[in-house]
Amino acid sequence: MTNVVVVGSQWGDEGKGKIVDWLSERADIVVRFQGGHNAGHTLVIDGVSYKLSLLPSGVVRSGKLAVIGNGVVIDPHALIAEIDRLAAQGVTVTPQNLRIADNATLILSLHRELDGIREDAASNSGTKIGTTRRGIGPAYEDKVGRRAIRVMDLADLDTLPAKVDRLLTHHNALRRGLGEAEISHRAIMDELSSVAARVLPFMDTIWLLLDRERRKGARILFEGAQGTLLDIDHGTYPFVTSSNTVAGQAAAGSGMGPGSLGYILGITKAYTTRVGEGPFPTELDDEVGRFLGERGHEFGTVTGRKRRCGWFDAALVRQSVAANGITGIALTKLDVLDGLDELKICVGYTLDGQQIDHLPASQAQQALAKPVYITLEGWKESTVGARSWAELPAQAIKYVRQVEELIGAPVALLSTSPERDDTILVTDPFED
């Protein structure tokens, strides 16, 4: 028995929600360890769709403990809204099935405003990142700048005013420079006071809770958000998110040691998608790209933005395997490729007349890198709903084997539809 870390191996939207839900049935605790409510996923359980952005997937399953770790930035308004939305669907979230790190950073209205102001200014200058405008980046900036308001501060009203003063000294200076009106101390205090009673009952010392449960033999599932290629260090900077999304962050973002992580499962889409700005070497602007987008329903859960689509990039996923220490992958959306005459896989790039096996970190070089493809025969048969290798066409199996060889990691699970049971299990990560 081992713990399992789930990470996206591409630019997010790999289908982590379904896989995490599938694994959460085997877990006792599900932990979010980074990001905020800027990346969502949809779970389909007994025909009912649940859209989650901040809450861990385990919250919709009875008998599971959902945990939001210290590495997450929490918008209390979004948290409360998500809890209320689930309640309307018959899912009750209480302190018995949700615990939140006392040292997690809060996203406030001023963070959301600053995010939007910057994106608008960047749009005018042609330098926008394509954020979700939800305040994630500014909140992480305050965390690193040691001026953030944290969950525990809601319980200490005596020291809160001084912390708000420190926060506003920074933010009002920024706002003056941007030509925006200053924010009053009272406005922030009122905002915090309005959410304290709803948030504080969930507060806990998470590192202690997880260490205690680990020692008792609990199975812990760490649920990553976004994807490796959006990591603040290892992604396509500056078109990245504001946190580390790689597996190592599961330790830092929860308070557990790296030795507690166990099996690293990389969720990997059978083709490639990206939302927003940034390099995308295998992007397809043709009929095939449109086919993938329509067949794969490639629209963001949180923003509704249309995703850019392209061929599978084995060179990028190979980097993700290395950066995360991926043990095995869950290959998703294989069924979307049904019916294509041929399939291409990127195995490297050409840059300045030379062939290279990885995407450079330089933004200028990324723009110049051209994909090198191999071509495989497609298949006409349907793979939708397949639950065993015997149900897959020979060419589909060949495609899967080629992916394994090129990325240097085996397929542990294979997903053939959005339904959780339409999954071919090769290796149970909890039993590896």
Swiss-Prot record:
Binds 1 Mg(2+) ion per subunit. Pathway: Purine metabolism; AMP biosynthesis via de novo pathway; AMP from IMP: step 1/2. Its EC number is 6.3.4.4. Its cofactor is Mg(2+). Gene3D superfamilies: Adenylosuccinate Synthetase, subunit A, domain 1 (3.40.440.10), Adenylosuccinate Synthetase, subunit A, domain 2 (1.10.300.10), Adenylosuccinate Synthetase, subunit A, domain 3 (3.90.170.10). Substrate binds at T301, V302, T303, G304, R305, K306, R307. It catalyses: IMP + L-aspartate + GTP = N(6)-(1,2-dicarboxyethyl)-AMP + GDP + phosphate + 2 H(+). Its main location: cytoplasm. It is found in: Cytoplasm. IMP binds at D13, E14, G15, K16, N38, A39, G40, H41, T132, R146, Q226, T241, R305. SUPFAM superfamilies: P-loop containing nucleoside triphosphate hydrolases. GO terms for biological process: 'de novo' AMP biosynthetic process; IMP metabolic process. Homodimer. Belongs to the adenylosuccinate synthetase family. This is Adenylosuccinate synthetase.
